[in-house]
Amino acid sequence: MALSLIFLALLVLCPSSGHSQRSPSPGYYPSSRVPTSPFDREFRTLWGSQHQRREQDVVTLWLDKSTGSGFKSLRPYRSGYFGASIKLQPGFTAGVDTSLYLSNNQEHPGDHDEVDIEFLGTTPGKPYSLQTNVFVRGSGDRNVIGREMKFTLWFDPTQDFHHYAILWNPNQIVFFVDDVPIRTYNRKNEAIFPTRPMWVYGSIWDASDWATENGRIKADYRYQPFVAKYKNFKLAGCTADSSSSCRPPSPAPMRNRGLSRQQMAALTWAQRNFLVYNYCHDPKRDHTQTPEC
């Protein structure tokens, strides 16, 4: 009996890791500086309107065997803060890509720019992967150069909404999860940094060719529909036609000084504990094409 009580006490005092870790405070919360925008004021349905539903402040997208769905911002931006709170589907979601991203692929087919947050589906018992990516004048053809960094998360993204955001300014791109910076991509030269205006997109689609274990596990439509929910949209920055004096929101307390020491500590924590793939460390990649590494 005494041993049983000790064991139970340890379970209470030392909960298992995985989806229960608490992130360190970044000390600065960019999302709190940007007001929430109604979906209809900022976005339009791009495709799959029959697979999109709006209820109060929640936009639901779903994928089945017939199609997925996507939306696009009404205006292009040349810099800014772009975020949304997203809740993912539990269970078997292999092959499914749920995304929030910036792109100008419709305006520059064949050499577009793109900045991605993608949730790559999984199988029961395994965590989602959050993939961040940056394309510069890449088209999705054989010449495309991806800059992927993949993470697991310190919480279960299927249990509640969490806020994910991209902050893009003339000097750097910062990816945030609940205001914790998880990745920075700095402008070292114009050739490897997106500078042309981009639109904001969200979508759910079948990426079976590559999304889960490099395409080994495909989407299984016995588990359809695959559902993603979005709310708390936050868009603020400089549109393509803003004056040259426009300044986007700052990723840190001190504008133009980079992330604070506390934010860098939070970023280091996230990468040390949850980074599972870094293109710069992949020996199979041709790093002459990624000089930033």
Swiss-Prot record:
It is found in: Secreted, Cell wall; Secreted, Extracellular space, Apoplast; Cell membrane. Induction: Up-regulated by gibberellins. Not induced by auxin. Down-regulated by aluminum. Residues 1-20 form the signal peptide. GO terms for molecular function: polysaccharide binding; xyloglucan-specific endo-beta-1,4-glucanase activity; xyloglucan:xyloglucosyl transferase activity. It catalyses: breaks a beta-(1->4) bond in the backbone of a xyloglucan and transfers the xyloglucanyl segment on to O-4 of the non-reducing terminal glucose residue of an acceptor, which can be a xyloglucan or an oligosaccharide of xyloglucan; xyloglucan + H2O = xyloglucan oligosaccharides. GO terms for cellular component: apoplast; plasma membrane. The record marks 116 as: Important for catalytic activity. The keyword ATP-binding does not apply. Residues 29-230 form the GH16 domain. Xyloglucan binds at residues 118, 131-133, 141-148, 209-210, 285. It holds the Pfam family XET_C. InterPro entries: Beta-glucanase/XTH, ConA-like_dom_sf, GH16, XET_C, XTH. PANTHER family: XYLOGLUCAN ENDOTRANSGLUCOSYLASE/HYDROLASE PROTEIN 8-RELATED. Catalyzes xyloglucan endohydrolysis (XEH) and/or endotransglycosylation (XET). Cleaves and religates xyloglucan polymers, an essential constituent of the primary cell wall, and thereby participates in cell wall construction of growing tissues. Involved in the accumulation of hemicelluloses. Has a high XEH activity and only a slight XET activity in vitro, but the main in planta activity seems to be XET, thus controlling aluminum sensitivity. Acceptor preferences are XXXGol = XXFGol > XXLGol > XLLGol = XLFGol. This is Xyloglucan endotransglucosylase/hydrolase protein 31. The gene is XTH31.
